[in-house]
């Protein structure tokens, strides 16, 4: 890449970043937080944060990348995607009706709410315990990270249930919403994330999600300023780099350490070059249609229910890894949201996917506002826990693609909804058995004496 080509890419990157950052800033000033703000920041991180890192790798370490014209296509496709997404998100198809009483879909009381978070926490802890009994601490047993996807590890499906510890702790926080509950959320979820990091053998997702939710709650409540958020972001990047070194068993120093930091940080937070690789091999892609979305559900079907279930699922990530990169190491490489749309239907699917994503984020914001307006604090805690708990799925959406997001959000909805139903059933059983007693508010002693 020549300096002239780099200068052209830099101009496009600056304009695109300024375009998205400006819209995000205006939205932040208007509402402080909603899921449009979160997705916009996540989109910036995924598709634009990596460009400076790539530039340093190219000019400092002479690392090979896709041709400049392909990198230009990747930047422009990301900017155009966001433009279509933003218009879709801001477009209102019907007039907004305010203060119209509607029959609630469900209600929650104190006992049902506490039962819900206990059930969610129980699902996570029991899954971790069973996985640990089968495999022990994989971080200290396995020699490479790719081994966690091999036949040496049993009970891999249980990992999908670990995450429900975070929604459980979110319910606990939203019932109190003070600084002590906020700090308790951070300590409990990060401690759980470190435990799963050691047990699973290097999975950092629970730690990243817990820290991100903690920061956004702090922004909403005014406990964290923007400069504190930036400082926490830098700390998070350094922390994820250190965990990555431990995960891959790397011992580096000097220039090698700087090089490793650049490419691991890029791959962790901003795999935008994967989109460029897909565009570079565009003519070799056999478009998969909507099949990757259907196939991604296969992993949730147990083999005893479907004995002939394919052992290998050809979703967009695996198609990109195996067919495009010809990589059969056992790891699935993230194609990104736009990359998954390219795998499914080429360039035509990019604006269509942007419209779908705009509607998805609009729905989450509607649910979030519903929780903000809810007078029943127990129901509000459940709604907010569901919305913030789905942040992990939004990260999956940006990094892994639309197919992975759909299957995971449906799974999250089913487990979360089932926990609610079980909590309501248990409350009904306890109430029928006479075990539930209403709380009585005792009058102050002075008032009691006055009435006497």
Curated annotation (Swiss-Prot):
Tell me if ATP-binding is a UniProt keyword of this record. Answer: no
Query: Its GO biological process terms?
Result: enterobacterial common antigen biosynthetic process
Membrane topology according to the record: Multi-pass membrane protein
Q: Which UniProt keywords apply?
A: Cell inner membrane, Cell membrane, Membrane, Transmembrane, Transmembrane helix
Q: What is its main location?
A: membrane
Q: Which residues cross the membrane?
A: 6-26, 37-57, 63-83, 118-138, 155-175, 181-201, 207-227, 228-248, 341-361, 378-398, 410-430
A Pfam match is: WzyE
Q: Which Gene Ontology CC terms are recorded?
A: plasma membrane
Q: What does this protein do?
A: Probably involved in the polymerization of enterobacterial common antigen (ECA) trisaccharide repeat units.
Q: How does it assemble?
A: Probably part of a complex composed of WzxE, WzyE and WzzE.
Q: Which family does it belong to?
A: Belongs to the WzyE family.
For this entry, the protein name equals: Probable ECA polymerase
Q: Which gene encodes it?
A: wzyE
